[in-house]
């Protein structure tokens, strides 16, 4: 699959190839929407119920795309469907290697996974990847999921870019904090009704031995990490109803609580 947005300075959005191993495993290589973020960020932009993403998605993520290797599986326990997934990516988001030979990848890899449980059976084809209940599920359908990721060296506020800031070790070489994200979410649909609820937490680790100056005389203070990474907690709840005529009504409530108070140089400004 190949998809681009030429209104963007970095137009490449999706470029990947997948191999299906029977019915229970799909292996994908390339750049695509990762499943290690919150539920709304898994959905493609054109499949959202509202014009933009919630402030939770905007604060903790960028486009949600990663370059790497993705493993997606599907298992059944009677009527219950289990969907475990694992991803190993560059940790620099889309267009990971920049626009030139000197715009190189920074930091380490990103490791993530997700487990979705569908206790009432599967949604109709594709209906769990859109905001509204376009398929008008005849029976109630519920998805409960959890995801986590570990970005081993982030140099972008949400871990989807590189070189936006540089921190150092004692010797003056570049050294970046690790960014850890956890998400829990659910999606419910039935006869035109849709409910999505999600929680996200982002935290930084490996801060010891990091300095803000290459001279190695200004150690990074714990609260100063808010100047570089979007950390904290957030939750989002969205309820909608889709009429048979195609008209829909949606309401959303979102809140983000940063881990530390923002400063004039924090990513929020």
Segments predicted by a language model, with ranges:
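Short intrinsically disordered coil segments
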Residues: 86, 129-135, 161-164
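Short, P/G- and charge-enriched loop/turn segments at secondary-structure junctions
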Residues: 55-58, 132, 171-173
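Outer-membrane beta-barrel pore domains
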Residues: 19, 48, 138-269
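A short secondary-structure junction signal
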Residues: 83, 95-101, 125-127, 156-160
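Short amphipathic alpha-helical surface micro-motifs
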Residues: 66-67, 123-130, 176-178
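Outer membrane beta-barrel
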Residues: 1-94, 102-122, 140-143, 148-150, ...
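Short mixed-charge
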Residues: 121-141
């Amino acid at each position: 699959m190949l998809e681009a947005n030429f209104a963007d300075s970095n137009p490449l959005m999706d470029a990947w190839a997948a191999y299906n191993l029977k019915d229970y495993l799909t292996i994908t290589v390339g750049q695509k929407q990762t499943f290690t973020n919150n539920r709304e960020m898994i959905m493609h932009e054109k499949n959202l119920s509202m014009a933009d993403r919630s402030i939770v998605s905007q604060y903790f993520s960028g486009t949600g795309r990663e370059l790497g290797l993705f493993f997606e599986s599907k298992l059944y326990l009677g009527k219950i469907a289990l969907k475990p997934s694992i991803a190993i990516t560059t940790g620099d988001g889309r267009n990971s290697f920049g626009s030139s030979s000197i715009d190189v990848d920074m930091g380490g890899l990103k490791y993530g996974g997700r487990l979705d449980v569908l206790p009432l059976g599967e949604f109709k084809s594709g209906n769990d990847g859109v905001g509204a209940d376009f398929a008008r599920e005849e029976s109630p359908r519920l998805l409960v999921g959890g995801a986590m990721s570990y970005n081993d060296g982030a140099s972008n506020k949400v871990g989807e870019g590189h070189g936006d800031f540089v921190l150092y070790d004692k010797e003056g070489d570049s050294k970046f904090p690790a960014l850890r994200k956890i998400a829990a979410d659910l999606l419910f649909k039935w006869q035109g009704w849709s409910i999505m609820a999600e929680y996200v937490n982002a935290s930084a680790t490996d801060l010891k031995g990091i300095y803000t100056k290459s001279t190695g005389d200004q150690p990074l203070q714990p609260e100063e990490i808010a100047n570089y990474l979007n950390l904290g907690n957030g939750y989002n709840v969205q309820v909608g109803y889709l009429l048979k005529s195609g008209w829909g009504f949606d309401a959303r409530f979102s809140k983000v609580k940063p881990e530390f108070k923002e400063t004039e140089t924090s990513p929020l400004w």
